Amino acid sequence: MSAFPPPPEPDAPRVAHVEPAPDAVRGILALADRARADDGVAPFNEQTRLTLGADGGPTLLLAHGTDDDPLGAAVVAHGDAGIEAELVVDPAHRRRGVGRALLDAVLAEAAGSPVSVWAHGDHPAARALADATGLDRARELLQLRASVAEARTGLGERQMPAGVALSSFTADDADDWVALNARAFASHPEQGRMTRGDLDDRVAEAWFDPASLLLARDADGRLAGFHWLKVDGGQAEVYVLGVDPDRAARGLGSALLAAGLDLLAERGHDEVDLYVEADNTPALALYRRAAFRDAAVDVQYRRA
C-alpha cells in the first residue's frame, strides 16, 4: 500500500493505494452498494464493476479516517488519453472532506495528464467539488425511461426493411457483432472500443440472455443492426441499439427498437430504461418519439 502525503489537519481523511485483492474489491463494492441505496444511483458504471480486481484493471484508492475504517474510494483507469475516475463516499461520512481528498489524490495520480471524472446522478456535491478543483462539465449521459406500452405506441407500425430478417444471438455471431458495434459507435469513447473479451465478459454475466440480443441481417447474411436488451433485477433496459452506418436513416433503428419493445411486452415488462449521449441528436429524436422521458443524468467533468 502506498500513501499520498497526508493533509495537514490531524483528523482529515488519508488516501492510499490498495492492491486489488478480493477482500479490498468486496469492500469497495459494498461501499458502492451503500451509496447506491442512499442516492438511488450507482457510483460505478458496469465496466468498472467488471474490471475491478482483474489483471490490468483500474487503480484503487481508499480514503481512511483516524480509525482506519474506509470512508470512500476512487477507481482510476489509465489510458492513452489520460485517466478516467469514479469516486464514491460512504453516506455516513459525507461533508467531511472525503470527496475532496479522493479527488486531490486522483489529480495527483494524473501527474499533469488529462483527467475525466464521472459524477453519476449529477449530485450537487459533485458539481461543487468540480468547481472547486477547476474541472469543466464536458459530457452528459442521459438516462431515459418509458412505459413499454407507451413507447411502442409512440413508434407506430414498424416493419423490418425489405430483405432484413431477425434472429437471436449465438456464439457464432460474436465476431460479426464486435465488428458492427465498432462501426456503429466509431465516435463513442467507450462503446466503440468494446473488444471480443468485453463481449465475452458480458455474455458470462448472470443477466445475459441470447434471446434478448436481436440481430438484423440482410438477405446476403451481412449483419446490419442489433438491439441488445438487458434485464437485471427485474429492470428492463435498452442496453445497446446499433445500426450499420450504411443503413442509417432507413428505418432499421426504429424497427429494431419496436421489435425489442414487443419482446419486453411479451415477457410482461411494464417499464424500460436506456442511456444515451445528450448530444446524440438522431438517437434522442427516435427515443423522444417513442415517449422516453428524462429520468437522470450522469456528468463527466474534465481537466485537459
UniProtKB/Swiss-Prot annotation:
Role played: Catalyzes the transfer of acetyl from acetyl-CoA to desacetylmycothiol (Cys-GlcN-Ins) to form mycothiol.
Family (UniProt): Belongs to the acetyltransferase family. MshD subfamily.
Source organism (scientific name): Clavibacter sepedonicus
EC class (word): transferase
Keywords noted in UniProt: Acyltransferase, Repeat, Transferase
Chain residues that bind acetyl-CoA 2: L241, G242, V243, A248, A249, R250, G251, L252, G253, S254
Positions of the N-acetyltransferase domain: 16-155, 164-304
Name by which UniProt lists this protein: Mycothiol acetyltransferase
Single Gene Ontology MF annotation: protein-N-terminal-alanine acetyltransferase activity
Record note on quaternary structure: Monomer.
